[in-house]
Curated annotation (Swiss-Prot):
It comes from Orientia tsutsugamushi (strain Boryong). InterPro entries: EF-Tu_GTP-bd, EF-Tu_GTPase, EFTu-like_2, EFTU_2, G_TR_CS, P-loop_NTPase, Small_GTP-bd, T_Tr_GTP-bd_dom. This is Elongation factor Tu 1. Residues 9-204 form the tr-type G domain. It catalyses: GTP + H2O = GDP + phosphate + H(+).
């Protein structure tokens, strides 16, 4: 039986990004250790292997599926998303990072800024992450003079991608020493937690709109049924509420029979919470990532829409050349990515990098859509544009 969740502090979602092996997962472990001490054991210590849990990750020592870890600071309750750090898994990072209220950029004090560090900061800008804080990790192995240079380099990088590089807090840590019980290293982790509290603003949660949660993952729990997980985008859900599963296939109705966050039972889930929702009478194969769970009748699936789109320049990491009629990239909306064919409107022959354009899009599968839905456009492993649905056609 799960214990009840204590909602006495505001909830906030943050993520870790940064180059592979710079210590993102170790940092997550160190934070749970310090938080567990701070909260008298209310937070469970998560060791490295528990966070790095997919079998292929452990074989390669890298984090693939975005892992959620809980911690409590002096001011807030957090879900920490350990964003994947391997180049093949940028797709996961897009959905992981776009669900966060802020990010910790982890940079090794030994290696400094690496190609993935740049790529992740660019992606954070592209998916609209509101704020970034920096942790220079592995300082026990680093040359102190080099640390100054690394800090300057990180500030320049953040400024380049329109984050406030001059004022971003940069905290020096040694996650591994903190894990091994070093008291000075633990102080560094605590300093990082305080900086997150103070620097990352508490987001406004949309509680008064109809419930909607993009589905990130689906599990089958023996004897209890099917659980879908995700971050609630808007509204509130209570046990006994009727919900619809919308997008990618025929809409289904079901009833919420349980809401949990970090294995603790909630009387209700609300916007901003990372939850598991137990669904009555739904089989594991009836539901998939990329669908949404919503209050009945509040959102419908569509394939065809018009959108206002900005196409990234080469300098922003986008295409080097224009695209034409019938271009078929992937559209990333919430937790799904679907191929769509683009029709250029008003007699346009092509769209150049750097252009703002109105396009008509026809997706190969219907997704839950409302006017104003944001999406990223990707092709061949890179983001080439971003847009919003301006009109639903069918």
């Amino acid at each position: 039986m799960a214990v009840a969740f204590n909602r006495d502090k505001p909830h906030c979602n943050i993520g870790t990004i940064g180059h592979v092996d710079h210590g993102k997962t170790s940092l997550a472990t160190a934070i749970t250790i310090v938080s567990s001490e701070l909260s008298d054991g209310a937070v469970k210590v998560k060791n490295y292997d528990e966070i790095d849990s997919a079998p292929e990750e452990r074989a390669r020592g890298i984090t693939i599926q975005t892992a959620h870890v809980e911690f409590i600071s002096k001011k807030r309750h957090y879900a920490l998303v350990d964003c994947p750090g391997h180049v093949d898994y940028i797709k996961n990072m897009i959905t992981g990072a776009s669900q966060t209220d802020g990010l910790i950029l982890v940079v090794s004090g030994v290696d400094g800024v690496m190609p993935q560090t740049r790529e992740h900061v660019l992606l954070a800008k592209q998916v609209g992450v509101p704020s970034i804080i920096v942790c220079i990790n592995k300082i026990d192995q680093a040359d102190p003079e080099l640390l100054e240079l690394i800090e300057m380099e990180v500030r320049e990088l953040l400024t380049k991608y329109d984050f406030p590089g001059d004022t971003v807090p940069i905290i020096r840590c040694s996650a591994l020493k903190a894990i091994n019980g070093d008291s000075d290293a633990k102080k560094g982790i605590l300093e990082l937690m305080d900086a997150i509290d103070d620097y990352i603003p508490q987001p406004t949660r949309v509680l008064d709109q109809p419930f909607l949660m993009p589905i990130e993952d689906v599990f089958s729990i023996l004897g209890r049924g099917t659980v879908v997980t995700g971050r609630i985008e808007r509204g509130v859900i209570k046990v006994g509420d009727e919900v619809e599963i919308v997008g990618l296939r025929s809409t289904q109705k079901t009833i919420c029979t349980g809401v949990e966050m970090f294995k603790k039972e909630l009387d209700q889930g609300q916007a901003g919470d990372n939850v598991g929702i137990l669904l009555r009478g739904i089989k594991r194969e009836d539901v998939e990532r990329g669908q949404v769970l919503a209050k009945p009748g509040t959102i419908t699936p569509h394939c065809s829409f018009e959108a206002e789109v900005y196409v990234l320049t080469k300098e922003e990491g986008g295409r080097h050349t224009p695209f034409f009629q019938n271009y078929r990239p992937q559209f990333y909306c919430r937790t799904t990515d679907v191929t769509g064919e683009i029709a250029l409107l008003s007699g346009k022959e092509m769209v150049m990098p750097g252009d703002h354009a109105t396009l008509s899009v026809n997706l190969v599968a219907p997704i839950a859509m409302d006017q104003g839905l944001s999406f990223a456009i990707r092709e061949g492993g890179k983001t080439i544009g971003a847009g919003k649905v301006s009109k639903i056609i069918k």
